[in-house]
Amino acid sequence: MSNTQLLEVLGTETFDVQEDLFAFDTTDTTIVASNDDPDTRFKSWSLCTPGCARTGSFNSYCC
């Protein structure tokens, strides 16, 4: 079914749809500045109990 036929089935106003309507432009590039250090953007902390798999604590995997 062509794009125009699909528009007729949906009951909308028909018009000529080009085939490249849904084509994606893959030539865009992302430039990351040299001072954009990923270590400054992402931080994580972990809090572990001293149980170390002996207490059955939910975070005893930290050992």
From Swiss-Prot:
Crosslink (Beta-methyllanthionine (Thr-Cys)) position: T49-C52
Lineage: Bacteria, Bacillati, Bacillota, Bacilli, Lactobacillales
InterPro entries, per database record: Lantibiotic_typ-A_Bacillales
Domain of life: Bacteria
The name this protein goes by in its record: Lantibiotic mutacin-1140
Modification after translation (UniProt): Maturation of lantibiotics involves the enzymatic conversion of Thr, and Ser into dehydrated AA and the formation of thioether bonds with cysteine. The C-terminal lanthionine undergoes decarboxylation. This is followed by membrane translocation and cleavage of the modified precursor.
Residues annotated with 2,3-didehydrobutyrine modification: T55
Gene: lanA
One Pfam family in the UniProt entry: Gallidermin
Organism: Streptococcus mutans
Role noted for this protein: Lanthionine-containing peptide antibiotic (lantibiotic) active on Gram-positive bacteria. The bactericidal activity of lantibiotics is based on depolarization of energized bacterial cytoplasmic membranes, initiated by the formation of aqueous transmembrane pores.
Sites bearing 2,3-didehydroalanine (Ser), chain numbering: S46
A GO CC annotation given for this chain: extracellular region
Keywords: Antibiotic, Antimicrobial, Bacteriocin, D-amino acid, Lantibiotic, Thioether bond
Entry similarity comment: Belongs to the type A lantibiotic family.
